[in-house]
Amino acid sequence: MTDTAPKAPVVDIPAITALVEPEVKALGLELVRIAMFGGKSDPTLQIMAERPDTRQIGLTECEALSRRLSEIFDEQDPIEDAYRLEVSSPGIDRPLTRRKDYQDWKGFSARIRLSAPLDGRKQFDGEIIGIDDADNVILDCPKVGQKILPFSAIERSKLLLTDALIAATQPLDSEGADQIVREG
């Protein structure tokens, strides 16, 4: 059976990053992730950013970054097809995309998916021990013990929502919460 679902446009993520990163830094933020997802009928370019000191971002900062990026993308036109721009915080069950994330979130539970199987499996859930000098993420997995996962082999990774994570992650404030509109 072939997958006939329309795919999101293929984009040059390094070229997009080169446009986005200076704007993110100009606002005192750090870039967490750039991703393109959705089908051909509703492609979305997602930009995740955060304040380095709090690992969060407020609604006002998301709006400011979105405006700056919209202007640049309108001028540079880095994506041929129509798409939607989404600027957001990484959220509580955030993706782990940078080496420093594995140090910053050590002691918390994560799900890591590898691009190729290791010991017969591609997905590992466990507590983050950290990242070593050889660029390996160390994860303590229930039932299988410690796993050493090469950072370069990670396809995607995210924190798992646990009581410990909820207790450790407090929102900065509720600014803009009354402006949230649910679609659908």
UniProtKB/Swiss-Prot annotation:
The keyword Glycosyltransferase does not apply. It is found in: Cytoplasm. Gene3D superfamilies: RimP-like superfamily, N-terminal. GO terms for biological process: ribosomal small subunit assembly; translation. InterPro entries: Ribosome_maturation_RimP, RimP_C, RimP_C_sf, RimP_N, RimP_N_sf. GO terms for cellular component: cytosol. Keywords: Cytoplasm, Ribosome biogenesis. It comes from the Bacteria. Disulfide bonds: none annotated. Pfam families: DUF150_C, RimP_N. Its main location: cytoplasm. SUPFAM superfamilies: YhbC-like, C-terminal domain, YhbC-like, N-terminal domain. Belongs to the RimP family. PANTHER family: RIBOSOME MATURATION FACTOR RIMP (PTHR33867:SF1). Required for maturation of 30S ribosomal subunits. This is Ribosome maturation factor RimP. The gene is rimP.
